[in-house]
Curated annotation (Swiss-Prot):
Localization per record: Cell inner membrane
Membrane topology: Multi-pass membrane protein
Signal peptide feature range: none
Native source organism of the sequence: Escherichia coli O6:H1 (strain CFT073 / ATCC 700928 / UPEC)
GO cellular component labels: plasma membrane
Keywords per UniProt: Cell inner membrane, Cell membrane, Membrane, Symport, Transmembrane, Transmembrane helix, Transport
InterPro entries: Lactate_perm
Main location: membrane
Catalytic activity: (S)-lactate(in) + H(+)(in) = (S)-lactate(out) + H(+)(out); (R)-lactate(in) + H(+)(in) = (R)-lactate(out) + H(+)(out); glycolate(in) + H(+)(in) = glycolate(out) + H(+)(out)
Gene: lldP
Transmembrane parts of this sequence: 13-33, 37-57, 70-90, 131-151, 159-179, 194-214, 244-264, 366-386, 405-425, 438-458, 494-514, 530-550
Protein name from the UniProt record: L-lactate permease
NCBIfam families in UniProt: lctP, PRK10420.1
Length: 551
């Protein structure tokens, strides 16, 4: 087949081209907010519209377009859906063996207040998982835990998506930062430093914001000491680790420091009033569990599934383990790489999105052993043995997990199909170039480019791979620091995670809200836009006023 070159301005006017390119996204917003369609229905129609735009407007060859849709769908199944299946399976093992009652009791013994439980589980534990694994696992695990603690499913999912803003940029051992460095040629350590001078401000704001969502102004007044301890310790550790150690460990270090500081603080301080969701939508929790006399050994045993999960995911994430499966590694043959027919290197990305015409690779990687989902599955198998779960119960639990997640898995596949047709057709790059045409105001809109990238792909890493080079080029054209705008792509991207169709589908799957994706999207969308504007203001101030903050 001939090499097809992407054309980012088929209409001859970048604004008209971007309007047509935005049709699938506008439909997706409309389908969830106004039509209130189920997630899998909205995603299916969005793929159909994106495919039509790619074929009719961008003149993408039919074979290339269909191949990108199929590639995206299978990428949604592996590795994304695999992570969710394994994570939900671990949670179900904990529930089925009766250990979750003890976990619930241990958290209630620290604090019965659900606002503070959100800080411990949703923020601290979630940030740790984000640093170790990323790619949807933190939200799936923490949201399921919070539902078990009595949170309303919608609130558990929505709050976990919002609070996940703080750690995403340094997620999965700093991969988003490392990728940004690779595609721009800028030192990834410096990018991490710059992100570490933007995100700490957002961390504090996000935690106060979460308290306001849960309990209004009263919630802020009653919990501010705990928020300052949790958010302040996290922000300081995030700044110090990103600026003096590197981009790989800020989430791990910050989350552990925050968890330790908050837990010690709550031994000395509790809010004057205990807050709990009283609506019927929340599962009822027996408050006497907080006073049940479980021994330290029983509590430790109950937490073992999640300790195993933490250990295996961390092991799978460290560079020496990853190197085994990289090209030239001892176990590289265990990774099956399949070039996608009719797509691999048959589409060319063109300037100014890249510096020169570049063939777009499309290789499906079936890393059956080194995938994060497999690490979580190992944790599940260890838990089954450790907790002496009957094999028949384990098999039935895994079967019920697959059955419950069948529809969400399809949704995730269609969401990734939309992301891939957007990327390979050039649709996403058209939207990016339109934003880059805003001149000196681009410092404000720069984070929106990262936001758009994460919305489309569900990943800050993928957003940087798509748009970081464009950010650097735009920065040079308007005379501001390319380091600043590449960092803004990363920082802005974290605010798009909470409304990414992929994240919405994962969160709904984890808490049993299948078919309620529109409710969750409406819950998070306004917060996402507000946070992105905040990052835009911070970036603009750093570009023109606070230039001393740039490394």
């Amino acid at each position: 087949m001939n090499l097809w070159q992407q054309n980012y301005d088929p209409a001859g006017n970048i604004w008209l081209s971007s309007l047509i390119a935005s049709l699938p996204i506008l439909f997706f917003f409309f389908a969830l907010i106004k039509l209130k369609l189920k997630g899998y229905v909205a995603a299916s129609w969005t793929v159909a519209i994106a495919l039509a735009v790619a074929l009719l407007f961008y003149k993408m060859p039919v074979a290339n377009a269909l191949a990108s849709v199929v590639y995206g769908f299978f990428y949604g199944l592996w590795p994304i859906a695999w992570i969710i299946i394994a994570a939900v399976f671990v949670y179900k093992i904990s529930v089925k063996t009766g250990q979750f009652d003890i976990i619930r009791s241990s958290i209630l013994s620290i604090t019965p207040d659900q606002r503070l439980q959100m800080l411990i589980v949703g923020f601290c534990f979630g940030a740790f998982l984000e640093g170790a694994a990323g790619f949807g696992a933190p939200v799936a695990i923490t949201a399921a835990l919070l539902v078990g603690l009595g949170f309303k499913p919608l609130y558990a999912a929505g709050l976990c998506l919002i609070v996940n803003t703080a750690p995403v940029a340094f997620g999965a051992m700093g991969i988003p930062i490392l990728v940004a460095g690779q595609v721009t040629g800028i030192d990834s350590f410096e990018i991490g430093q710059m992100v570490g001078r933007q995100l700490p401000f957002m961390t504090i704001i996000v935690l106060f914001w979460i308290m306001a969502i849960m309990d209004g102004w009263r919630g802020i007044k009653e919990t501010w000491p705990a928020v300052v301890v949790a958010g302040g310790s996290f922000a300081i550790a995030q700044y110090l680790s990103s600026n003096f150690i590197g981009p790989e460990l800020p989430d791990i270090i910050s989350s552990l420091v925050s968890l330790l500081c908050l837990t010690l603080f709550l031994k000395r301080w509790q809010p004057v009033r205990v807050f709990r969701f009283g609506d019927l939508g929340a599962s009822q929790v027996d408050m006497t569990l907080a006073h049940t006399g479980y021994t330290a050994g029983q509590v430790l045993r109950a937490w073992t599934p999640f300790l195993f999960l933490t250990a295996t995911v961390t092991l799978w994430s460290i560079p020496p383990f990853k190197a085994l499966f990289a090209s030239g590694g001892a176990l590289y043959e265990w990774v099956i790489n399949i070039p996608v027919p009719y797509l691999d290197k048959l589409v060319a990305r063109m300037p100014p999105v890249v510096s020169e015409a570049t063939a777009y690779a499309a290789v499906f990687k079936f890393d059956w052993f080194s995938a994060t989902g497999t690490a979580i599955l190992f944790a599940a198998l260890l838990s089954i043995v450790w907790l002496k779960m009957k094999p028949s119960d384990a098999i039935s639990t895994f079967g019920s997990t697959l059955k419950e997640l069948a529809l969400p898995i399809y949704s995730i596949g269609m969401v990734l199909a939309f992301a891939f047709i957007s990327n390979y057709s050039g649709l996403s790059s058209t939207l990016a170039l339109a934003l880059a045409h805003t001149g000196h105001a681009f410092t404000f809109f720069s984070p929106f480019l990262g936001w758009l990238g994460v919305f489309l792909t569900g990943s800050d890493t993928s957003s940087n791979a798509l748009f970081a080079a464009l950010q650097a080029t735009a920065a040079q054209q308007i005379g501001v620091s390319d380091l600043l705008l590449v960092a803004a792509n990363t920082t802005g991207g974290v605010t798009g995670k909470m409304i990414s169709p992929q994240s919405i589908a994962i969160a709904c799957a984890a808490v049993g809200l299948v078919g309620k994706e529109s409710d969750l999207f409406r819950f998070t969308v306004k917060h996402s836009l507000i946070f992105t504007c905040m990052v835009g203001v911070i970036t603009t101030l750093q570009a023109y006023v606070l230039t001393w903050m740039i490394p």
